[in-house]
Curated annotation (Swiss-Prot):
Pathway: Amino-acid degradation; L-histidine degradation into L-glutamate; N-formimidoyl-L-glutamate from L-histidine: step 1/3. There is a cross-link at residues 142-144 (5-imidazolinone (Ala-Gly)). GO terms for cellular component: cytoplasm. It comes from Brucella ovis (strain ATCC 25840 / 63/290 / NCTC 10512). Contains an active site 4-methylidene-imidazol-5-one (MIO), which is formed autocatalytically by cyclization and dehydration of residues Ala-Ser-Gly. This is Histidine ammonia-lyase. It catalyses: L-histidine = trans-urocanate + NH4(+).
Amino acid sequence: MTIILKPGSVPLETLKKIYREGLPVRIDPAFHAGIEKAAARIAEIAAGDAPVYGINTGFGKLASIRIAAGDVATLQRNLILPHCCGVGEPLSENIVRLIMALKLVSLGRGASGVRLEVITLIEAMLEKGVIPMIPEKGSVGASGDLAPLAHMTAAMIGEGEAFYRGERLSGAKALGKAGLKPVVLAAKEGLALINGTQTSTALALAGLFRAHRAARTALITGALSTDAAMGSDAPFHEEIHQLRGHKGQIDAGRALRTLLEGSAIRRSHLEGDQRVQDPYCIRCQPQVDGACLDILRQAARTLEIEANAVTDNPLVLSDGRAVSGGNFHAEPVAFAADQIALAVCEIGAISQRRIALLVDPSLSFGLPAFLARKPGLNSGLMIAEVTSAALMSENKQMAHPASVDSTPTSANQEDHVSMACNGARRLLQMTANLNAIIGIEALTGALGVELRKPLTTSAELAKVIAALRAKVATLEEDRYMADDLKAAAELVADGTLSGVISAGILPDLEA
């Protein structure tokens, strides 16, 4: 199956499919005429006498230097190679595929001035599985993601490196093995390819998709913890949340209420419970998780716009002029990444407090210490809770906003930058930490519910426990725990736990 992209109106769901499923993509042929028209206009400008940035001039601080018409193609090649300054581990294949798809969307709007053969090469590389080797670090998020996108472009011109069928090869060899030929860049094409926010945006989208799946699962584990602790579902009453009015809170409250529906554990303490109120980590879940859902949705709107944007420079406008602007500045992406980081941090923080509640016999309303069946002889989930605290703390440290950390670059020509790529890239580690925290809560919540037998939980939560137990056996006595924690985190990350819940209960990214 090939995804057909309509540049300017590619929805979030399509971007998610590209990221998760690695499907090949193509630009809708209806956009080809606009692409070719802009390319023809760039060719005219390159042949003319008027200096236009990036077409017949140098770059950045060297923009005042005029380039002769005979050197325009050499200029584009020379632009790519010294910009390949990335460091660190290669970005994963699914991230690079998303970067390339986003670049197609941007170029496909017909304002960048690249020829159709540049578009078709990217499409063919995605179809045949030629994945440029892009190091993870090196972009400040203005002027676009220059270093990472230069590594992408290097593979296209037969330089740099690329992965093909699991092998890391030179760009030329990877293209050759796939039956493809390198492109010879024409005027402005190198600049159009490396100038843009596609790396930052792809990383932020990956963080968003991972964070949203974790947020949905955190509502499930939060409901499990509520039942395990014999908490009240009264704070999830719909009218409470309607009176405040925040959409995320309303949706989170509804999800928690529905997940707990029919629990025999809940019915058992409706009368005669001496506790007047539960701790905040139980009672305020709709307020906290709902606020996180709201900012994830706001970030999603920003990133969907950015994914469809033209972010190189200069741009060919509708009147045929090539005009320099600043769409390459990734401040919107940086802000979105910072928002996602805050949500990830807070979802993990309140989840960790519920884990701590369940292992503490002074708070868990009758559960044994650390959920060990023979406390003292067994330590139960004592150190699993400590691990969750370590992960929570690391996420707090990483949640500092990257967008406020501008520094001048390129001899002060590029004197304010977004740091969007740094802000987006850290989301991969933060969401991995969050998956592990929520996985630990799944283990504590499920075990806490099991320790309430013969009382049973709701039908929805019983499905979650069954999915967990298919991979992780219930804890009867102390055993090696690292494999349990890894398996539980994977069930969060791959959507297994959220996938067993009936449709319509868990909130979507689109409000």
